[in-house]
Amino acid sequence: IHLALEKDLGKSAFESYMCETGLVLSEITYMLRHIHSFAREKRVWTPLAQFHSRSYKKPCPYGVVLIMSPWNYPFLLTLDPLVDAIAAGNTAVVKPSAYSPHTSEIIRTILQECFEEQYVSVVTGGRAENTCLLNEHFDYIFFTGSQAVGKEVMQHAARYLTPVTLELGG
C-alpha cells in the first residue's frame, strides 16, 4: 500500500500511514467496536396524540452504494466510506480514481480478496466508466472530488432521486 502511494503521489511511508492507512484501520476498529449500538433500535419521543404507542428509530441500509474517490487520498477516501457502507449493511460499487493507478490496483486486489463480488465490486477506468456508472441506478452515491464533477454526479442522481454525499474541493 505504501509503495503504491509513493509511486502515485510521492508519499513517504510515514505520511501514507498517518494520512491514509492508519485512519482506515482506526475507522475499522471504531466500527467493530460500535456496530451493535449503531444497529440497535432506539426509542424516540412519541407525540401525545399517540399516547398508547411507542416510537422507535430503526436503522436500515440503503442498498447498493456507489463510492467514487479522488486521486489525492485514494486509499483513505475509498476505503473509509466503504467501511461505513458495509457496517450499515449496504453493498457497494467502488470506483477509485484513474489518476492513482497503483493505489487503485492495490484497492482492487484487497477488495477482491476480502469480498465476494456480489457484496463489493471494483470498477477501474476513467471518465467513460464514471459516466457509465452514473447512468446506472444506485441507492446512495458517495462522491469525493471537484465541484464540476460533483455537479454532474448530482444531475445524474437527481434522475432517480438518489441521496448523495458530496465532498467537494476546489
Give a label for each model feature:
Residues I1-Y56:
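N-terminal Rossmann-like NAD(P)+-binding subdomain of aldehyde/semialdehyde dehydrogenases
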Residues H2, V24-L25, M31, S104, ...:
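A general structural signal for well-ordered alpha-helical segments in protein cores
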Residues L9, L25, L32-K42, L66-N72, ...:
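Generic hydrophobic/packing signal
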Residues G10, R33, S37, Q112, ...:
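Generic secondary-structure signature for well-ordered alpha-helical cores
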Residues T46-C114, L161:
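Conserved small-residue-rich beta-alpha loop and adjacent elements
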Residues E20, Y99-T103, E167:
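Short acidic-hydrophobic sequence patches enriched in Asp/Glu that either
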Residues V64, C114-G170:
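Conserved NAD(P)+-binding/catalytic subdomain of aldehyde/semialdehyde dehydrogenases
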